[in-house]
Amino acid sequence: MENLRRQYNDNVQKFKADFADCSDFLLKEAETGGRKCFFAVMDGLVDSLQLGQMIMGPVLGAQVKARTPGEQFRQLMRTCVQSVELKEAETFEDAYYYLMSGFCVFVLDGCPRAMVMGIQGWTKRNTDEPESESNVRGAKECFVESVNDNKALLRKRMKTHHLKLRQIQLGTAAPTPVVLAFLDDRAAAELVNAVEQRLKDAHLNTVADYGELVPFLDTNMRSFFSAVGTTERPDVLASKLYEGRVAVLVEGTPFVLYVPYLFSDNFQSLDDYDYPPFFGGFVRLLKYFSFGISVFLPGVYVALGTFHQELIPTNLLFTIASAEFRTPLSLMNEAIMTLIFYEIMREAGLRLPKVVGHAVSIIGAIVIGEATVSAGLIGAPILVIIAITAIASYVAFPLYDSVSVLRLLFILAGGLTGLYGLMLGMAALFVNICSLSPYGVPYAAPIAPLNVRSLGDVFYRESWTKLARRRVRVQDLRGAHIDQCE
């Protein structure tokens, strides 16, 4: 890193040369206390009113009597500047980073360091209702793209000095602020250090989105199930931190990462805790049942229709046979083709504008679906099975990516080897889930290894009077070895 220089002209020329052809770079040369100085800002990132009233006015109008530039610099910094965020930068790289973070950079002739003052004023999105984690009851606020605003939203939720927000810079070409959030009295120090080390080992040019950090934090990269959770809700993140987890906030994205992420987390939603226990437990069981349907139902149907027709009731068998008699494809090929078409239609609906996307969904679901059945390309029973599967896959939405691939694999297993291959595939899936241990915590905990006392928030939901007494931390789960996490 190159240090700032004492010679005023050298600093001015360096700034102007490095920001040549940058129309948003503004540099104002002036004089204060008999010495030359300059102010540098990025247009659009600072508040112009604060720049004039809180920084330039007081500094240029100061009557400072100092024998050396260093003494004058310290007096200006101590008595004249009214910015809350007041720091020093000794290198050009640090000064440029603050400059592009909404700070004003002040350089004085004869002083080899810069004064940086925070007067951010860029345009930002207001806190709105979360789109990916909608709820019927509860709060309606979500994180935004500014990491500073996200820190404030989290701090507002968790009014405790135990909440630590440790900031680091990632990216060699364009440093990006990344914040580690954790409760020092709840999270294990080994977990915090492991997450921080993984982030520091991520040698990226820049961090444009949170997804670029997921591969460095995920310990389950060879599995269908991720060890990294995401949320855009401050209330959800607060509850995860109370369980001893560590969160990662990234500048430029409203989604926050947290680890470790367990299998049971996929079936928990905010509304579960607002419902009465009996209904919350029913909804929770419904989610597990929907996950089973979305993964296994097409494969079971294909296996029964191809190899085990004797297990199907006679009336239903006649219905399936009459529908499939007119189609040119086998049950397995029909199921795969219908699923692939459904994924294409879903992807088109996501990428197109909302108004057009709804039209595509309606046309695909009604017109094309009915036309393919009428033309005899696919049978009506398989269309019903795929429709039920598609709807069920949205109930446990965090698992949608995994479910989309797994059900295709189980269709292949059922179509090629019948129920025997399907059962082997199920066993392999369960073994894979139970063998994962992200950051030293069993992924299937508290189901495997079984801990009955911790099941009150897994398959069903206990009342808050019991949950409040059992605020379990992830490192307290049976089989957890946080001290062995990497």
Show where each model-derived region lies.
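Hydrophobic alpha-helical segments embedded in or immediately adjacent to the lipid bilayer
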Residues: 291-311
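Generic detector of multi-pass transmembrane helix bundles and their immediately adjacent loops
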Residues: 300, 313-486
